[in-house]
């Protein structure tokens, strides 16, 4: 909040117009990649996915290509995007770098096998094994991702499919035959076999709507669908462009935190916690 870390157990007290600085998430993703290489912990991949889809993808204006400095979490608030000539923040520099990194962190490998961490259409070649993995999906618009193996000769190795913590009943098929999934959400589904050219894997991860409360206030919740944090479509009425750096006294100046998100709290989501 306001470019500073705070006690993570006091999240509900920091839902403002200055949350989610993009440079911070940029560096947290970089740190997460290193941590995963050291630990192989699937919870790190879960975090990476949530940050990637909810912050990095949400940072860019799909119409103009401009990007945000902050991602406001205040109910009823809206995002402010940079402009081509008057607004250039640190989050513009790292912001555009972010959007050149979608090919990172999808796959990892060690001596035991290859890890699939993200469900993004892509292709990876493991040269030492002579194996190529092609992934096809429209996730998160669909719950299924599909893989095709390319190999000049049979390769014995393990494919580790991330079993996200947000999915409860994963279904995996290899060449059309169901694989027994004994692992629990928040782990990896390990498939070890002699992989041949044109072998196919299909993994389906059902998504459902869930409520996630802040750690310090059970009455403040986020609404999620799978890894996606949902937000209402409110249109563009009342939105204003950010002020240029040369005018720090402007009403929406980021640099002195004088800007107040024009939040209409009447649009806040109200949930009956007894009957969610």
PLM regions: where:
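Structural helix-adjacent loops and short alpha-helical linkers that scaffold large soluble proteins
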Residues: 36-46, 153
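Beta-strand-rich binding/interaction modules
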Residues: 154-175
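Well-ordered alpha-helical segments within folded domains of soluble proteins
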Residues: 17-36, 92-102
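C-terminal beta-rich recognition modules with glycine/proline-rich loops and embedded aromatic residues
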Residues: 45-54, 59-150, 184, 193, ...
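Short strand-turn-strand beta-turns centered on an Asx-Gly dipeptide
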Residues: 173-179, 226
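Solvent-exposed loop and edge beta-strand segments that line ligand/cofactor-binding
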Residues: 1-25, 83-91
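Short, surface-exposed beta-strand/beta-hairpin micro-motifs centered on an aromatic residue
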Residues: 188-190
């Amino acid at each position: 909040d306001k470019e500073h870390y705070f006690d993570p157990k006091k999240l509900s007290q920091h839902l403002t117009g200055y949350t989610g600085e993009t440079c911070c998430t940029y560096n947290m993703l970089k740190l997460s990649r290193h941590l995963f290489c050291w630990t192989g912990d699937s919870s790190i991949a879960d975090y990476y996915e949530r940050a990637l889809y909810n912050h990095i993808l949400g940072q860019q204006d799909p119409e103009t290509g401009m990007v945000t400095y902050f991602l406001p979490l205040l109910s009823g608030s809206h995002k402010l995007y940079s402009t081509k000539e008057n607004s250039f923040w640190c989050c513009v520099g790292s912001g555009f770098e972010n959007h050149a990194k979608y090919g990172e962190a999808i796959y990892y490998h060690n001596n035991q096998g290859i890890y699939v961490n993200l469900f993004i259409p892509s292709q990876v070649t493991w040269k030492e094994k002579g194996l190529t993995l092609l992934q096809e999906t429209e996730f998160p618009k669909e719950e299924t991702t599909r893989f095709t193996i390319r190999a000049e000769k049979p390769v014995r190795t393990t494919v580790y499919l991330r079993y996200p913590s947000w999915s409860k009943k994963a279904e995996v098929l290899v060449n059309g035959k169901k694989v027994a999934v004994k692992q629990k959400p928040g782990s990896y589904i390990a498939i070890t076999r002699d992989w041949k050219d044109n072998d196919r894997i299909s993994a389906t991860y059902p998504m459902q709507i869930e409520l996630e409360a802040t750690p310090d206030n059970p009455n403040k919740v986020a609404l999620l669908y799978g890894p996606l944090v949902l937000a209402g479509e409110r249109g563009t009425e009342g939105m204003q462009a950010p002020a240029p750096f040369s005018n720090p006294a402007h009403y929406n100046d980021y640099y002195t935190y004088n800007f107040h998100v024009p939040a209409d709290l009447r649009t806040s989501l109200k949930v009956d916690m007894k009957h969610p």
